[in-house]
Amino acid sequence: MIDRILIIILSVLCLCTFSGSCLAESVTPAPSSEPSISVSTSDEAVGTIADPLEPVNRAFFYINDKLYFWVFKPVATGYKAVIPEDGRIGVHNFFSNVTTPVRLVNCLLQAKFKGAGNETARFALNTTLGIAGFFDPAKKTFKIEKQEADFGQTLGIWGFGPAFYIVWPILGPSNVRDTVGYVGDLSFDPRTYLAYYFVIAEIVNAGTWVLDKLNETSLTLGEYENLKKAALDPYIALREAYSQYRQNKIRK
């Protein structure tokens, strides 16, 4: 399962890089155009991320937008009507607890040893006192905050730049670094190995992924609508918001 995912995503990245290079060679930029298309080795303090695949990205943005309003939002709204907020927060806590190894390993890779210790303590407390992670006594009782750490962030701290912007179908906004980081995080996620070794677990894993995303959507309904309403160009607004969000996570 992991090998298949790696091959598919890395193949797409190679195609994207080749396409971006061809586009860069065929177009002579005007003096006031976007920054030149290049793979940077570090995050830039200011400026817009390169977007050589903008026509393709806009097409995927349009598809994702329609999927959200026609599929995800209606389903999430129905789910929200059936499951009370406390229950949905419990589901969120459960999946957050399951993916503790992702944050723990990345804290270690970033030399944030206190954060790694916090994640270890949180996992122990929430798995036991929190009933398999559905509750979060580590935060509420012991004041131990969850550490936000992922492999895309780790690569940024190591000095790798975002390269250029990518919009993936269903998954949404990303960049080259965060796409590689997403694949890296899959290797730290316990659910990946269950799906790899057990056929039935692969089906269950897909179901848990859908439930996780559905649950998260139900907890954030309205945020995307507000972004679209406030933006002259929602595509650019989302691109800039995502890029700034990721840069801020790396600088923490």
Regions found by a protein language model. Name each.
Residues 7-17:
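Bacterial N-terminal signal peptides
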Residues 14-15, 79, 138:
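Broad structural signal for hydrophobic residues in well-ordered alpha-helices, predominantly aliphatic
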Residues 22-113, 200-252:
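N-terminal targeting leaders of membrane proteins
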